[in-house]
Design a protein with these regions (language model features):
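Hydrophobic alpha-helical membrane segments
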Residues: 1-263
Length: 263
């Protein structure tokens, strides 16, 4: 099986699973809207009332809030990807399901954010490093809620995943960025390393006032919901797999199907 056959096989399987997930759980598309609004409200409250009192310590405490919100969203995505259903019975507990894993990854992001200013006032260098890190660690959210990895292991597993699946993984991400760029959103937001763990959530803020900007943001967030589910399904297909292994399994399945037809 050549590269393009593998690409077609993988994407077709991921798309079919994604459509099935959405058909059975359409509410999942509202995830980025609900959690994005919750995220925005929490950050505004923190920035206005708490950050001025804590100063530099707020850099460690704000990720606590972010980690809890992402934990709940990742828990919902996990239910859909693994079981093709959403359960709200343990909704309150979902805010802690992946909390420690997410915060451990955020901690490293904080350390990196302290190191990068040492490069001085070099915007091009900062952007270049940010893009490289976003590419290498792009699937870190999936490494957490699907791969079950945490702290430095989550980052190292991302690099391993990238070595084997760089093109298959990054092509949908680039397409997603281009679509949002056409919609009027800056592609730079998706290339900021500080937002790498938030990719399945999107980074499109809504205004309290209704307007065309809010309509575009809602459409972008719905698109993000579709993309987040697709990412999860794509990750489950590619993780711990190789093109050779997929070729063997695909050929085995084709032979089995032909045998069944003859019988």
């Amino acid at each position: 099986m050549n590269f393009f056959e593998d690409l077609t096989l993988v994407y077709n399987k991921a798309i079919k699973k994604t459509l099935k997930n959405i058909k059975n759980n359409p509410v999942i598309l509202l995830g980025p809207i609900f959690y994005g609004a919750l995220y925005q409200i929490a950050i505004n409250i923190f920035s206005i009332f708490i950050a001025p009192l804590l100063g530099v310590l707020s850099g460690f405490l704000l990720p606590i809030v972010s980690s809890m919100i992402l934990s709940s969203y990742f828990s919902m995505l996990s239910d859909v990807i693994y079981y093709n259903r959403i359960s709200f019975n343990n909704f309150t507990r979902s805010f802690t399901d992946y909390f420690s894993s997410i915060y451990s990854v955020y901690f490293i992001l904080i350390i990196i954010s302290w190191i990068t200013p040492m490069l001085g006032n070099l915007p091009v260098a900062h952007l270049f490093i940010s893009v490289i890190l976003v590419v290498l660690f792009n699937p870190i959210a999936e490494e957490i809620y699907i791969g079950g990895n945490t702290y430095t292991q989550a980052y190292s597993k991302c690099v391993e995943f990238f070595k084997e699946n760089a093109f298959l993984w990054m092509l949908p991400f680039i397409l997603y960025l281009l679509i949002t760029q056409v919609m009027g959103f800056s592609i730079a937001n998706g290339l900021m390393f500080s937002n790498v763990i938030d990719i399945p959530l999107g980074n499109f803020q809504m205004s309290p006032l209704m307007g065309t900007s809010n309509i575009k943001a809602i459409i972008a967030l719905l698109l993000t919901g579709v993309y987040a589910i697709f990412r999860g399904n794509l990750f489950t297909i590619l993780n711990n797999s190789t093109r050779r292994k997929r070729a063997y399994m695909g050929e085995y399945y084709d032979d089995w199907r032909k045998t069944r037809k003859r019988n």
